[in-house]
Design a protein with these regions (language model features):
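Phosphate- and other anionic-substrate recognition elements at nucleic-acid/protein interfaces
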Residues: 2-179
Length: 179
């Protein structure tokens, strides 16, 4: 085997890690596990209880997924403040709760010394040309993408997680240096 081929194979091994993609929330989190660039699990989990209990359950579930699927890298969605409910503070309350969930996931990645990427929603949605179409339409288009691409009919949360993971894989592939 030539040195160039050995180098390419080593780079490919780095490219196709076991990836966990999350569309996290305080109650239902969609997730997708990718191995060798393909989704092998597309699912979600739901937690209940007060916010503190839910945060602990989310943390433990993510730890379980990382161990079960031998995850090398995690990608999760950044949060954004949205103008909701005619300008009332519903958006702010939701944002604060999502910030706590985000903080738990972010801290966990640091604690576990995991490779991770945080993707703003507008960035991964732009990859699929669904950004700026309104929440309802974006969710439906993400589901349609997953069905058309992977043949899997899934929930909105599962579709978003799958698209987030696919975005990272496409981005890694476009940045791969074949020389």
């Amino acid at each position: 085997m030539t040195m160039l081929l050995v180098s390419v194979l080593a780079d490919l091994d780095l490219l196709v890690s076991n990836l966990l993609a999350l569309d996290q929330s305080s109650t239902t989190t969609g997730y997708a596990v990718f191995k060798n660039g393909k989704p092998v699990v597309i699912s979600h989990f739901t937690v209940s209880g007060d916010l503190g209990d839910r945060l602990e359950k989310i943390r433990n579930k993510i730890i379980g997924l990382i161990k079960e699927h031998e995850i090398d890298e995690v990608v999760f969605e950044d949060i954004q403040l949205q103008d909701m409910a005619g300008g009332r503070d519903v958006g702010i309350k939701t944002f604060k709760i999502l910030a706590e969930v985000f903080g738990v996931v972010h801290e966990l990645m640091t604690e576990l010394d995991m490779d991770y990427t945080i993707v703003p929603p507008i960035v991964w949605k732009a990859t699929f040309k669904i950004a700026g179409k309104g929440r309802k339409v974006e969710k439906k288009l993400a589901q349609e993408y997953v069905l058309a691409t992977y043949g899997i009919n899934c929930t909105e949360d599962e579709a978003d997680a799958t698209c987030i993971g696919t975005h990272i894989i496409k981005k890694q592939g476009s940045e791969f240096n074949w020389s």
